[in-house]
Structure formats: structure tokens, C-alpha cells
Amino acid sequence: MNVTASRRTSFAGWAGDHALALDTLDSRLAVDDLEPLRDIVGGARVVALGESSHHIREFYQVRHRILRFLVERCGFEVYALEAPFTQGQVLDGWVRAGPGTVEQVAADGIALSLGRCREMHETLTWMRERNLTAAAPPLRCLGTDLPGAAGSPLPALEEVAGYVRRAAPEALAALEQAVSVARRFHDPVTITALGRYQSLGPGEQDLLTSALSLLMGHLQRLALVQRARGHGAEHDTAMWHLRGAWYLDQLHRANAQEGFESASTFRDVYMAESVLRLLEGGTRVVLAAHNWHIQRTPAADSQGNPLLPAGAHLAAALGDDYRAIGVTSSLGRTTTLGEPTPERPQGAWYDAPLPPPAEGSIEAAFPTDRLWTLADLRAARPHIDDAASFQHSRMADYFLDIPVFEAFDAIAHVSRTTGTDHVLTRAEG
């Protein structure tokens, strides 16, 4: 008889006895309680922090405390967000003593109003204050996602216009063609921009694709020259804006043929590549994105076709240098995204009941008699006999099919959650 196997227990039993029980989410308190996190992280170059729902107060707080630990104790230098790379530049400027208020830069730099809450403001403010007082290299805060809330390439095209005029005026015609088409369907609301693109004629759609390809090819050909002139960083940034615009064009085309579920994974390719390009020189990165985006494993759409999240790309590129920490909860409230309103043009986030943990969900295994719990799934696996049974995890107000022990290296479980101060309560009746 295998003695080791006979001594195995359930994950619920292991979590109750061995997972790290934590009793504070206060971002101001010392992070000594998170010292066991060091074993989860190891020498990883990228640590991803998830969330099962957006606009959850406690999830922002969990991320803030873990970010502090990774920065203060492990030397991480970049906080990369599920936010547009192009518009997110204002965040990086602000945390390094740039102008403006935290409320304004968070609203401008983070799509879908995910920056419009006190908890995100507190994280950005902590980063700025640390940069003003610490002798260490400055913390950076960068977006990783497609431009225009993954709806319009216009912000990226406008961002590179000045560089194109200076470095490659002969490419202005291609830029102007792309801008002229982008303006025809531009809208800050993602779903509106997606619909307007579909109303373009095939000739206009082809013109946009052609112009973007010509522009990218022409600028890429100048890379060596621009670097020799000392403009390498500016050139690389301009190319990254354009790459986001190009991927977004591909998303629009795929949306018409495959549907948005599949097309949206162009976001994930770009998010993963945006993180990987930050790793030069040994930089370590914390990525904050939804649990779906950070999972290590491929997913599938409703027809069974493969979907590749950003985490799958990062795991393939980095192997053991990538860690995915899912963040979820068992009790309390969650949020759902409703239709845009004049006051909430990017969509209104509404409070919603949190269904009880489903059978076979990872949430069902966690104790709820503490504020939150951090469980190292990799450490647990040799000691449990039911890892393969956990095939579900929360996504907003429902449960997603996901092989939890393959998808995540650790789980941060908050016992009870609430919406942020930006979340609305639906009117009765």
C-alpha cells in the first residue's frame, strides 16, 4: 500500500489546517503577515493577481497588500494593469510625480471605470508616495490592454501622430488614412464602437487594415536608424501603440466572423506581450487582471474552440517564472456590468447577490471563519486526494468551468465581499 497516498486528505481539510489565515486588509499596516507568500512566488519574474469580479472592494485591498509585499520584500518594480497601454500612460506619469489628481488619472487611464473607486486611488497614491520618498528605483504603473477600451484604435493613432511627423513624415498618408476610418466608428463605449465598426463597408474595413499594416511596416524598417540616433525607447513605444491598434483591428475582423468571445482573445495576446516586453534587465512585474485572463490553462468557447488567456501565453513563455494567484470569495455580494447611461458612459456596475459556492467549485473548500485565506495550491497538491475534482470557480454571479489546480498556483480567498463605492444598487420593481 502507498503510505503517502493513504495519508492524503481533502483540499478543504488541508486548507483549514495549513493555508495562511489572514486578519487584515488594511493597506496601511505592515505586511509581515504575508511572509509565507515568498515561498509561493519564489524566483518568478511575473506574478499575476486575479479577481473573480470587477469592482469588489476587498479584491482591490488584497491586491494592494500583496503588491506592497512584492515591492517591499521581493523587489518587484512594475504594476501592470488590465487597462489600455495607450491611455494608461497617464498612470505611469502620475505615480512618478506627474500632474493631476488621482481621481482624474485613474478615470482617464483605466477603462470600464475600473479606476473609479477609493481602493484603486489608495493603491496609486501609495505608489506615488513611495516614489517620492524611497531611494529604490521608481515603481511603474502601466496598462497592458488594447487601446480605446478594446473598441477604438483612435487613441493609439493620435498618440503616435507626433512621432510619425518627426521620424517618418513619408508615412503620414498611411496614418491619415487609418485615422479617417477610425474616426468613423470611434466611441469611448466599447460595445458602441464594435457596432459602428460592423456598419463600415468592406472597402473601409480593408483600408484600415491596409493602412495599419503599411504604417507598422514602414516604422519597423526605421528601428535601427532611430536607435542609432538615440530615439530607441520612443520608437519602441510608438511601435507598441501601433501594435495595439493593429491587434484591435484584427479583433474587429474576428468579431464579425467568430463572435466576440473568441475575438476578444486578441486582448490576451497583447496583454501577455505587453508584460513580456517589460522584463528586460531583470525587471519583475505584478500583473493585475481578471482571473479569466491570468489563468495558466487554455479555455474553450461555447462551441469547444480553444481560447488562450494572457496567462496561458505567459506560462508558455516563462514556465516556472510565471505565477498566477486567483482571487475569489464565498459570501457577500458581487457586481455585474449593465448598459451604459449618460452618467456612466462606459457601463454601470450594479450590486448583485453572490450565489452560494457550487459543488466542485474551489470556493466550496475554503473556511469562512477568517477575513481571508491564502492557499498555495502547488504545496497542497502532494498532500490531497481531490485536486482534480475542482473544476469550477466564480466569475461575477455565476461559475466558470476551469481546472483550478492547473490554472492557478495559489488562491486568495476572501470570506465575504462587497462592491466598491462606485457600484450602484438597482431600483426595486
Question: For each predicted feature, which ranges?
Answer:
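Structured catalytic-domain cores with a bias toward divalent-metal coordination
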Residues: 1-429
